[in-house]
Each structure stands twice: as structure tokens, then as C-alpha cells.
UniProtKB/Swiss-Prot annotation:
One Pfam assignment: Myb_DNA-binding
Residues in coiled coil: 243-288
DNA-binding region(s), residue ranges: 28-57
Upper lineage: Eukaryota, Viridiplantae, Streptophyta, Embryophyta, Tracheophyta
Record domain HTH myb-type: where: 1-61
Protein name: Telomere repeat-binding factor 2
Organism listed in the record: Arabidopsis thaliana (Mouse-ear cress)
Main localization, broad class: nucleus
Gene3D superfamilies: Homeodomain-like (1.10.10.60), Winged helix-like DNA-binding domain superfamily/Winged helix DNA-binding domain (1.10.10.10)
Family note: Belongs to the histone H1/H5 family. SMH subfamily.
Residue ranges annotated for the H15 domain, each copy included: 121-189
Gene name in the database record: TRB2
Biological role: Binds preferentially double-stranded telomeric repeats, but it can also bind to the single G-rich telomeric strand.
Amino acid sequence: MGAPKQKWTPEEEAALKAGVLKHGTGKWRTILSDTEFSLILKSRSNVDLKDKWRNISVTALWGSRKKAKLALKRTPPGTKQDDNNTALTIVALTNDDERAKPTSPGGSGGGSPRTCASKRSITSLDKIIFEAITNLRELRGSDRTSIFLYIEENFKTPPNMKRHVAVRLKHLSSNGTLVKIKHKYRFSSNFIPAGARQKAPQLFLEGNNKKDPTKPEENGANSLTKFRVDGELYMIKGMTAQEAAEAAARAVAEAEFAITEAEQAAKEAERAEAEAEAAQIFAKAAMKALKFRIRNHPW
């Protein structure tokens, strides 16, 4: 039999949450190798982090694993809450209410990250979701758990907050504000950030011909590119120089990977075209041979 598993300490749980917020879910090796969390999580493995994160996700919604199992069996289909103006009555905490809890004897006195930050009240959940996606600054988008953890870290949340976040994310992705790709949410290409000015349409001149940019076939690609650029700029706004350099390096790596794939696809297309030409030549030669045999056959 293996050694009994050690109980997770508050410091380890806080480090795990902070690691997921920084690197995203599923990046267990990256979290363990990060110098910010490696010292606290030195006695944990990838499987430990994965199992603990699953337990945290369950208890964050239902309060306990037993309640979660019972709720999944008994919960009737609830009514949709798509009203964006529904205010959540949450009392804002002051700095005095956010004092760090004393650590247990023999434990490390570092405490959990971001423990002394004051939490704000929530008035519009959609704005808070936009803030979370923007501040998490994940180029591929943020998953639902990361968004909820950001809200939980910065706001005082009720027990059923995760369900509200899930409902709002589903609504925002259905109306086109957000795009959901592989369980991750990001701003859609036609999303205009608050405060961004939209330029009036202009006429483009090419020689003596005037083109109307309001036609979708002529200006659709330019508008789509502009909105995508605005969305990316809004995502990386406020990045430090190091974070911007890392984001640029990731973008370059993705572009190089896309170029490599395109080159491979082009080579495969050329190979298929050459094979098709060879097959066509062989078919013509076979047809000529057949006609020659028929013509010279002694009947």
C-alpha cells in the first residue's frame, strides 16, 4: 500500500488557484515548475493538482461533493436568467474585513496571494465578465473556471455565483458578444470595446473608380480585420513589456506553425496533382494500347 496522502493546506490551495489564474487549467507541469508556486507545491504531483482542482470546482458550486451529487440528481430544469440588469445584492468589503487568516503552527507564514485586496460589489455581471477576460489576458481565451475564480478573488460572491456566471457566458456566446472555442471564451471579432470610436464610412478611390465601402463583398474583410485588431488590442491593453514580449512570441510561434501547415498542405496538393496527372497519362496510354489491339486483331 502507498503512503497516505497529505491533507491540502490553505497555502497550497491558494497557490493552486493562483497558478490556474496565471497559467490556465490543465497546465499542471507549468504550475509546478513556476518558481512562484514550486516551493509551496513541492510535495504535490500533476495528478494531485488535477484531482484537487476538480474538487475545488465542485465545492465552489455546491459547497461539498455530497451536496453536488445530490443536487445533480434532484435539480429540476431551472428558469433562464438572461436579464442583464439583474443586480446581485453583494456587500462590498473594506480592507479591515479582508485581513489574512493566521496560519497553522508549523506552516509557512507566506499566506495566500491577493489576500489583502479589498473586494468590490457587483452591479452588472456582464461587465465583470468582460473585466475578467480582459485582465486574465489569455490569447486563446479564458475558461469558465478561470473567469469565476477571478470574480471570486476580486468580488464578494454568493454561493450560487458560478451558476450565474455560466448562464451569462452562455447568453453572451449565443448573442455573438463572446466566442466559445474548446470551452474557452474570448471576445468576438465584431465586439467593440466600451469607449472605442467607430469611424464613419469613407469612399476608397482607385484611379477614377469610386467604391462604396458599405457593400459587404468589398468592405466586409476590412471591417472584420479592424474589429479583430481592436479586440486583440483591447485584450493586451495594460500588459507589461515582458508580458507583451511573451504574447508576441506566442503569436509568432502560432504564425510559423500556420505557415508550416500551409506549406505541408501545398506540398500534399502538389503531390496529389502529380499523381492525378500520372494516372491520367497512364489511362491515355492504356486506351491507346487497347485501341491498337482492337484495330490489329484478326477477326
